[in-house]
Amino acid sequence: MRKELLKKVKRVVVKIGSGVLTGENGGVDPGFLDGLAAQVAELSGQGTEVVIVSSGAVAAGRQALGLPDRPRTLPQKQAAAAVGQSRLMRAYEEAFSSYDLKVAQILLTRDDLANRRRFQNARGTLDTLLACGIIPVINENDTVVVDELKFGDNDNLSALVTNLVEAQLLLIMTDIDGLYTADPRTDPNATLIHQVGAVTRELERGAGGSGTSVGTGGMATKLAAAKKVVKSGVAAIIFAGRGERTLSRVMKGELLGTLFLPAGESLNRRKHWIAFTIKPAGSIVVDAGARDVLARHGRSLLPSGIAQVEGRFDRGACVRVLDPDGVEFARGITDYSSQEVEKIRGHQSSEIERILGFRYGDDVIHRDNLVLL
């Protein structure tokens, strides 16, 4: 199954974590980048387009600034990223030019992808670069981003980029062999899971833990990234990036790492964007009946099923949809503001115009703008 799935891949996103990219001195490892460039050149020669999501700017800046530990505050991280990003790209250029490959730097914030027009513009730019045979190297724009606009980590960014460029595969290179039944660093009985058909709550609980001294993402963030892409019908593989030509071997179907199979019913690109790219501005709590109608029958959310409104949001904002226990089970684009929803909640759609003095439609969230999680 793995080999057959990988044969169909024509565009792949490769996420490279700081723990893989950096050497013992904490800076970018030129030997690793040379090996990576050789493997990317091999894939490109076979007709596979490669997009790289690379960490490492903060780590490179930390080395240049002589900082003993990873920066903790946002200003420190931004200063380190400002110093390190140019060094990171220079290292990529030097390594890839040896194989006649050109690279392009793309720096993104969450706001770039949350805005649909900018999302589409970014897609057009990346498509053009790939058509020209150029390897995009994408990173979060750490020098200007604020906490509320952060992707959180590059694992999450790689999942969003996979949707952005419509890749058929996400590869996450990390410092361990893949997803284990337990933490292999503390449990000698932990075994590698070679294939995952569905990301369950049990798997998510077992993947806890934070990042390393040079990176922000632990296995939990990688599992979350895999969960995002499989929902749009894309496979993901988490594997050790420091082994011998592991990228090439994975792409040839060798049994390395953990393969996450695509979901049977996949989200279209727009619904994936709603579910995972836009940051929710608030929440709507629905009653048990409304939850059942939405979850089982794929209907629109009507005001009659709304029990509570949390937060302030405008018409057209993304909101979480919570069940009576406060558990999020859906997200959607609302046709009414929080103040308007507060006034019409619990009422029939036929009463909207009488209550508000106007009416955008019968639905608070139309089913075309609603995504079950």
From Swiss-Prot:
It comes from the Bacteria. It is an enzyme of class 2 (transferase). Substrate binds at S55, D142, N154. It is found in: Cytoplasm. Pathway: Amino-acid biosynthesis; L-proline biosynthesis; L-glutamate 5-semialdehyde from L-glutamate: step 1/2. Pfam families: AA_kinase, PUA. ATP binds at K15, T174, D175, T216, G217, G218, M219, A220, T221, K222. GO terms for molecular function: ATP binding; glutamate 5-kinase activity; RNA binding. It catalyses: L-glutamate + ATP = L-glutamyl 5-phosphate + ADP. InterPro entries: AceGlu_kinase-like_sf, Asp/Glu/Uridylate_kinase, G5K_ProB, Glu/AcGlu_kinase, Glu_5kinase, Glu_5kinase/COase_Synthase, Glutamate_5-kinase_CS, PUA. GO terms for cellular component: cytosol. Keywords: Amino-acid biosynthesis, ATP-binding, Cytoplasm, Kinase, Nucleotide-binding, Proline biosynthesis, Transferase. Signal peptide: none annotated. Its EC number is 2.7.2.11. GO terms for biological process: L-proline biosynthetic process. Residues 281-359 form the PUA domain. Catalyzes the transfer of a phosphate group to glutamate to form L-glutamate 5-phosphate. PANTHER family: GLUTAMATE 5-KINASE, ISOPENTENYL PHOSPHATE KINASE. Belongs to the glutamate 5-kinase family. This is Glutamate 5-kinase. It comes from Geobacter sp. (strain M21). The lineage of its organism: Bacteria, Pseudomonadati, Thermodesulfobacteriota, Desulfuromonadia, Geobacterales. The gene is proB.
